[in-house]
Amino acid sequence: MTEKIFKINGIDICTESFGNPKNPAILLIMGATCSMVYWDEEFCEQLANTGKFVIRFDNRDVGCSVTYEPGTFNYTVTDMAEDAIGVLDAYHIDKAHLFGMSLGGMITQIAAVKHPERILTLTLLATSVIGSDNNTRDLPPMDERILTHHANGTHLDWTNKNVVAKYLVSGSRLLCGSKRTFDEKRVYNQVKQEIERANNLLSMFNHALLQGDDAYEGVLHSIQAPTLVIHGTDDTALPFEHGLALIDEIPNSVLLTLEGAGHENHPDDWEDIIHAVIEHTSKI
């Protein structure tokens, strides 16, 4: 694996790659407030060992990429999609498979709408529609416990790394599915990396200021790339119905249901996820 910082769209974006650059590329795009460390290193290596060139990167305002003062609202999800395409440019990759989780899945959808010529396939994990063809669609909201947890963060002493680590671990616990074992040691190690790597940890909350874009209403039907939707039945952040909505709106899509999984990329599911992704991406 090799970590590199590139100047992309005039800003620093931190990336890391796994595997042989000559292999077909899979770009991993993580969700809101989370850096690339939440794509577990072992997961990336397992994916690369199947014959893929795997790239993960820090979105704006997390990890070692550019950060802005907390409370700053100066970019859009579309800008983040352009960053993802810029990562492909930086690695001199003409076309790639995109794999996005949560907000990363929405970034992936926008990239597919704006740059279809760059996309081989899409994989959308624990995410939702960027814009619906169905104006009457009423998708279930995020669990109140998660919203309360986020609200409690405003009273936290963010200078105390131990307090912050405990808070972030407890947030991950809320996302774990009822039929998955929460591995506190694993999550703590991720959180520790997150805290130590961050240029400005509090800047991650700028992602909460991102707003939807009406320009993407009713455009999902235009996505032609084969799409694999992966969703847990016990997702408390974006309930299972969000995954079903994607299947309903993206023409060439299939669903992998993770029974009892939450809003997570849980190690118990890696074998099924990687098998499905390899089968999905090998068709192109």
Predicted feature residues:
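Alpha/beta-hydrolase
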Residues: 143-218, 225, 245
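Short beta-strand/loop motif that positions the catalytic acidic residue
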Residues: 223, 229-231
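Catalytic active-site module of serine/aspartate enzymes centered on a nucleophile-bearing elbow/loop
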Residues: 253-284
